[in-house]
Amino acid sequence: MIFINKGTKHFFYKKKLYIFNVIKFSKFNKFYLNFIINKILLICYSKGKGFQGVVKRWNFKTKDKSHGNSLSYRTLGSTGQCQDPGRVFKKKKMPGRMGNKKFSLFVNIFFRKKNYFFLKKILPGVKNDILLGKIL
């Protein structure tokens, strides 16, 4: 295990190098220890943002704030046709929960020492989040 002081950690932070400590190896093979690992697959979850409207979730335009729109300028508008289909089609962009989705990223390892990985990539999720990494 290596110890990193705050100055070194700040240097890596400025260079956008992220430090990961491997907590647990799942079915880790000793075969990988003899070779240089250049790529890993990271599986992580994005930040959850809760229930959001269509303006934030799907980048819809807002209506006029004046001319009679006092409360409904951030609403969806029309969702479907008239009597002919009589329903709203599937995959319609509507309000709902945003974020907390699973992401898979292929990341090149910048530097590896013992059980620390230094990666140069912007990763989704919150700080101190647990990521799942698969060696390729």
From Swiss-Prot:
The UniProt keyword set, sorted, is:
Methylation, Ribonucleoprotein, Ribosomal protein, RNA-binding, rRNA-binding
Please outline how this chain is modified post-translation.
Methylated by PrmB.
A Gene Ontology molecular function term of the record: rRNA binding
Per the record, the GO terms for biological process are:
translation
The residue range of the signal peptide is: none
Q: Does the keyword Transport apply?
A: no
Entry keyword Cell wall biogenesis/degradation: no
- Residues annotated as carrying N5-methylglutamine in the record are 83
Q: List, alphabetically, the InterPro entries matched.
A: Ribosomal_L3_dom_3_arc_sf, Ribosomal_uL3, Ribosomal_uL3_bac/org-type, Transl_B-barrel_sf
Q: How is this protein annotated for GO cellular component?
A: ribonucleoprotein complex; ribosome
Q: How does it assemble?
A: Part of the 50S ribosomal subunit. Forms a cluster with proteins L14 and L19.
Known function: One of the primary rRNA binding proteins, it binds directly near the 3'-end of the 23S rRNA, where it nucleates assembly of the 50S subunit.
Family membership, please give it: Belongs to the universal ribosomal protein uL3 family.
What is the name listed in the Swiss-Prot or TrEMBL entry for this protein?
A: Large ribosomal subunit protein uL3
Q: Which gene encodes it?
A: rplC
